[in-house]
C-alpha cells in the first residue's frame, strides 16, 4: 500500500512539473522590453495635434574581427560590431509651442545617425 501512495505522489508531482514547464512562455527573451521599430505618438509634443516619431529596436550584433580585416586597421580592434537604428523614412517639420519638431510619417531600420528633435 505504501508503494502505491509513493507512486501516486510521484505521478502527481511529475504531472505538476510538466504543467509548469508547458505553461512557461515560449518567447525569444533576447530583446525583452524592446519592441520592434514602429511609429509611435510622442506624448510630450502631442498637445494640440499628434506628433509621431520612430521608436523601438533594430538589429545589432558583435563578432570577432577577422584577421585579414584586423591587418588593415590603423588601431586593431578584436571585436567588430554592426547595428541598425530605428530611423524615419519620411519627415516633415512642424511647430509646436514655438519649437520646430520633426513629425515622422514612416519608419525603418537603417544606418544609425544622431538625430536632432
UniProtKB/Swiss-Prot annotation:
Keywords attached to this entry: Disulfide bond, Glycoprotein, Hormone, Secreted, Signal
Cystine pairings recorded for this chain: 34-57, 37-86, 54-107, 58-109, 85-112
Transmembrane segments: none
Cellular-component GO terms for this entry: extracellular space; follicle-stimulating hormone complex
InterPro entries: Cystine-knot_cytokine, Glyco_hormone
Subcellular compartments: Secreted
GO biological process, one term: thyroid hormone generation
Glycosylated sites: 78, 103
The protein's assembly and partners: Heterodimer. Glycoprotein hormones are heterodimers composed of a common alpha chain described here and a unique beta chain which confers their biological specificity to the different hormones.
Described purpose of this protein according to its UniProt entry: Shared alpha chain of heterodimeric glycoprotein hormones. These hormones bind specific receptors on target cells that in turn activate downstream signaling pathways. Involved in gametogenesis and steroidogenesis.
Family: Belongs to the glycoprotein hormones subunit alpha family.
Protein name: Glycoprotein hormones alpha chain
Amino acid at each position: 500500500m505504501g508503494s502505491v501512495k509513493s507512486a501516486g505522489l510521484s505521478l502527481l508531482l511529475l504531472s505538476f512539473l510538466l504543467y509548469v514547464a508547458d505553461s512557461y512562455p515560449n518567447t525569444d527573451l533576447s530583446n525583452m522590453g524592446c519592441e520592434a521599430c514602429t511609429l509611435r505618438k510622442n506624448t510630450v509634443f502631442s498637445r494640440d495635434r499628434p506628433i509621431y516619431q520612430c521608436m523601438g529596436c533594430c538589429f545589432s550584433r558583435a563578432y570577432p574581427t577577422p584577421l585579414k580585416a584586423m591587418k588593415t586597421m590603423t588601431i586593431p580592434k578584436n571585436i567588430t560590431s554592426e547595428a541598425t537604428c530605428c530611423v524615419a523614412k519620411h519627415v516633415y517639420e512642424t511647430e509646436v509651442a514655438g519649437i520646430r519638431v520633426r513629425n515622422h510619417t514612416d519608419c525603418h531600420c537603417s544606418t544609425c545617425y544622431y538625430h536632432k528633435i
